[in-house]
A protein has these predicted regions:
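Conserved MFS/SLC helix-loop-helix module at the cytosolic interface between two early adjacent transmembrane helices
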Residues: 34-70
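Cytoplasmic helix-loop-helix junction between adjacent transmembrane helices
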Residues: 79-119
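Helix-loop junctions on the cytosolic side of multi-pass membrane transporters
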Residues: 154-168, 361-372
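Structural signature of the two symmetry-related core transmembrane helices
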Residues: 50-64, 254-269
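Residue-level signature of mid-helix packing/kink "hotspots" within the transmembrane helices
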Residues: 29-37, 121-122, 233-241, 325-326
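Helix-to-loop junctions at the C-terminal end of transmembrane segments
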Residues: 35-47, 239-252, 336
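Juxtamembrane intracellular "pre-TM" segments in multi-pass secondary transporters
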Residues: 159-194
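Helix-loop boundary and gating motifs at the non-cytosolic
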Residues: 1-29, 190-195, 199-228
Length: 373
């Protein structure tokens, strides 16, 4: 509801150069990176339910904090806290699904969960845009109340799915770091993560920068802009299954470069457009790339990983977003201040082309299980 417009809020509240405003996302990405690694051990040690509740209540407090923040350091602290609390709920839900669903049904369970989440993503920006175009404070309060209410529901009605085993050894953070060290020695995995991270830098520009870019330079208000992220969510809901049925007929290393090629096109469309419809078209183009690449890349990593380490490899693969978030928005802010408002999008297009080339370099690597059909 609020997240797509957060850069607008901080920009208008702080009245600082764009580079300073976008650098706040670095606080979020750094803490989110650390929390994503630690969350797995936390949910295994303390239980899924408790960690999820902490994440939801913590996020609620952060949203309330935005109402009172007036200085850069206060926003930085809140962004850091947001990055710490956010992954706790996500990792907890993933663990609960794994606990409740047998291995042969997990792919479908995660797919249904992703579709359900995107229903919220579709409705949230519309409601948020209507409220935030009038007052951000009410929007923050609604978001905080919703998160706290959901946390209370989980606390009261969700059962703990972690089975306590007296003699079983639980994975520690040290174990996860050791597996991460092993994964980083896998050159194909590292190349894959690097390729995906470059592509995700383009995505961060669309999700973090586009809203403030559209409002400050073209007067597109939150209530109208909200249809752009909503379009992304609706496309995921209605097109993901059909597109995956097509792409799974081909090797992942041939599919991923095709999907990645949509991202630089989206960047160029933003750069040359100056209207709502141009920005909407750019989001549609990028979303097609997401629909093609996201599930395919996940399958590639899963097939690349040792069978007993697939979950952790996928977890490490998810860190690509936080790396991209630490680079993309801050670089965009610097380019905006030092060159022009269009510079970040042309730079994003170049990075997108590099990601396509990087994905093409993976074609000589084809894990034995990558073909899904």
């Amino acid at each position: 509801m609020v997240w797509p417009f957060l850069t607008i809020y901080t920009s208008e509240k702080l009245l600082l150069p764009m580079a300073a405003v976008t650098s706040l996302m670095t606080f979020n990405s750094v803490s989110g990176f650390v929390a994503s690694i630690a969350a797995g051990s936390l949910v295994d040690y303390f239980g899924r339910k408790g960690i999820m509740v902490v994440g939801l209540f913590g996020s609620a407090v952060v949203y309330l904090g935005y109402i009172f923040a007036v200085d850069y350091w206060q926003f930085g602290l809140l962004m850091f806290a947001s990055g710490m609390f956010g992954p706790l709920y996500r990792v907890g839900t993933d663990a609960i699904l794994a606990d409740m669903v047998p291995p042969e049904g997990r792919a479908q369970a995660y797919s249904l969960f992703r579709m359900g989440r995107n229903v919220g993503v579709a409705l949230g920006p519309i409601l948020g845009g209507l409220v935030l175009s009038r007052t951000y404070n009410i929007g923050f309060m609604i978001a905080a109340i919703a998160l706290a209410s959901f946390g209370l529901i989980i606390m009261l009605f969700l059962r703990e799915t972690l089975q306590k085993q007296e003699n079983a050894r639980r994975e520690t953070l040290q174990d996860q770091l050791r597996v991460l060290s092993q994964a980083l020695k896998n050159k194909v995995f590292v190349r894959m993560v690097g390729s995906f991270t470059l592509m995700e830098i383009c995505a961060t520009l669309m999700w973090v920068i586009l809203a403030v870019y559209a409002k400050q330079n073209y007067g597109i208000q939150e209530s109208r802009y909200s249809w752009i992220p909503t379009t992304n969510a609706l496309m995921v809901i209605f097109l993901q299954v059909g597109i995956t049925r097509i792409t799974q007929k081909y090797p992942e290393t041939k599919v991923m470069p095709v999907g990645a090629a949509f991202y630089p096109v989206a960047m160029i469309l933003v750069a040359i457009s100056g209207s709502f419809w141009g920005f909407l078209l750019a989001m549609v183009v990028m979303t097609f790339g997401e629909l093609i690449t996201a599930p395919t890349a996940t399958a590639f990593v899963a097939n690349l990983a040792p069978p007993d380490q697939r979950g952790r490899y996928l977890g490490f693969f998810g860190l690509a977003w936080y790396v991209a978030l630490s680079v993309g928005p801050m670089s965009a802010g610097f380019l905006t201040d030092s060159i022009s408002i269009h510079a970040p999008w042309y730079a994003g297009a170049i990075i997108g082309v590099v990601s396509v080339v990087a994905f093409l370099s993976l074609r000589k690597f084809e894990p034995t299980e990558t073909k899904l059909a």
